[in-house]
Structures are given as structure tokens and as C-alpha cells.
């Protein structure tokens, strides 16, 4: 019973004097709010905006790098059908009508350009 009385009295004292710290906390909060709008705080914000700008630049560079590493479109090799319904011929080849099998398939083929 005596221990309960001691704990209850401590509880009452803690609640009574615990409110005194609340006023101190409110004063500290007011100081923090006032300090936020000073020049020091604005000077701290400038590097943050610079950091955000650098991150934006970095993201665009990474996108360009990802595009550069992407796979190129495939091209047709020699003796492969070409034309409007097919992909383009590789470099060094031209899309021409041939006498051989071109007439059978009714489409031009990728061939080496004739030198004549």
C-alpha cells in the first residue's frame, strides 16, 4: 500500500512539473521557426537547389547513355528481300530488282551495287 502511495505521489508531481517543460519547448519552437526564415537558412537552401539541378542533368545524361547503348535496328544482308514491307539493306548494299530469283518472289533484293 505504501508503494502505491509513493508511485501516485510521483505521478502527481510528474504531471504538475511536466507542464513547465512544455512552455520551454514552445519557446524553442518559436526560435526554430524564426531561424528558418533568416539568411542562413536561405543560404542552406541554395546548395539544395543546385543539387536538384545536378540530379536533373545527371538523369538526362543517363537517358542519353541508355539510348546510345540500345540495340540498333537490324539491316538486311546480301540476297535478302528488301522494299517497303521489309527492313533496309546494310551499308554497302543496295535494294535492286534482280534477274535471278527476284522475279519469282516479286520483290527487290539487297545486292552489292553493280560497278557498270
Curated annotation (Swiss-Prot):
Has UniProt tagged this entry with the keyword Ribonucleoprotein?
A: no
Chief localisation class: secreted
- Does the record's keyword annotation contain NADP? no
**What is an example of a GO molecular function annotated in this UniProt entry?**
toxin activity
Q: Name one Pfam family in it.
A: Toxin_22
Annotated signal peptide: 1-20
Q: Where in the cell is it found?
A: Secreted
- Propeptide position ranges: 21-74
Tell me the InterPro entries matching this sequence: Toxin_22
- Protein name stated in the entry: U16-barytoxin-Tl1f
